């Protein structure tokens, strides 16, 4: 949501992409097998984003370096054709399994991403529903599957196709809201092997994962004031979660070093927009 810049709260700098990047880089340096995911809504919320219709955001995200991202409803705010252009500007996979062209049912995005981590194959599938993408309901050419039931069926088709190639762990990246995540988890066949749902849209701040149908559901609010950290040990014999810890880590100057290169890059955009819109 364009939460690029830190704010001073209680005499402490909080949030902002440069400290978020500093924390992610710190974890990547300290730990092995780190994956950084975004569950949609990179766009909007900032004049820096709006002035450049998301191009500035994608350039900032390229420096932030997520491993995999799914789309949210605000990704289509500048139009679907522009989103397809933006997707080509990204240096990271943007996945969605159920956004398609109505006339021939071809997908608009890569539906999944397989991460190879320490000998494991981790399958990520991106999901959004038409209830979230209200602005596409009248579109005669482009749309999503109508409801969460069809989203569940699409997950099943992908899992059944790729599980035979020895997928070790499956994560669904959604942008449908926490209540819908719970409904979705309840619909998934255990034989499909879904382990985790990482959700967005409802901005739900979960202190602990919620388990539905033996699937762990997590969400970490919104913005850059915090990040969800999910440390998972996988039983590779069962291809399932063995143990885990979940926490929401504050992004502030007491926890996070600043990524100065990214800060300078953002300030370049801020200076340009300030000159255009700033008051004398």
PLM feature spans:
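Active-site nucleophile-His-acid catalytic modules used for acyl/amide transfer and hydrolysis
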Residues: 262-280
